[in-house]
Amino acid sequence: MTDAQATVSQLWVYPVKSCAGVMVQEATLTDMGLLHDRCWMVVDAHGEMVSQRDVPQMALIQPNLRLSDVVLRAPGMLALHLALFQVQEPVKVQLWGQIMPAFDMGDVAAQWFSDFLGQTPQGKALGPLRLARFDPDHVRLSSTQWTGTVAAKNQFSDGYPYLVCSQASVEDLNARLATQGHGAVDLRRFRPNIVLSGIPAHDEDHVSRLSWQAEEGAVVLQPVKPCSRCPMPNVDPDTAAVNPLLSDVLQSYRQDRRLDGAISFGMNAIVTQGVSEEVEPLLRVGQVLNVTYQL
């Protein structure tokens, strides 16, 4: 039974993990997330992930997805063009303690990231950086603690293929900020893939399924885990300045018992119907989704 309806108001793809996102009008759903989402990841000399948590200036790297390449731009840098379907030698990379195969993207990309992200705001030298592309033959699964029997695949996301957030949740946060005399923030700080309008603030926390009819058939997304929040939302996506105010405000009302009191905002989601290696439907801004709430 459908309990309500919501409308897709925004779609976001993040080609390079921890860099800026691309707002799109339509996106292809794959069994590993939106097409091209978190395909690439910046790594240090040891192959470990580099992110805005330590290097907030990554927020200033702006991607542009085109038919055959992605173009990266950053202040003071020439544009870097990455072919969508070309890689170099295989490498091993590490993400949250998981070691996995990937492909190096070559010396030009490595030098570009090393030049722009040469050191942290604290002056700590990062050393040489490399850019890696996810190996699509590798199967990286979400935690079955939250997905149950569903084998949900990921690329370089933190752990789940989709992140869903309601527009009203951000508006509610901004209302709280305003009462304290602070300016508004936008949802880019929370890095969602699918933004919904038409449901109340944080109703995504209580949704059991989001469904709609694509041209290929019925599609079902299942929110499975609250998205726990590290300090990354404190990074201003326009300036890369860091201010802990946002975390302080979230701490006052978004401690989640399901996460032992950690801050949550938005829901990680998986596909349970209608998407496979053979079937990859489009999702468009303006699509109306059927919302079923948890009992």
What does each model-identified segment do?
Residues M1-L295:
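Metal-cofactor-dependent catalytic cores
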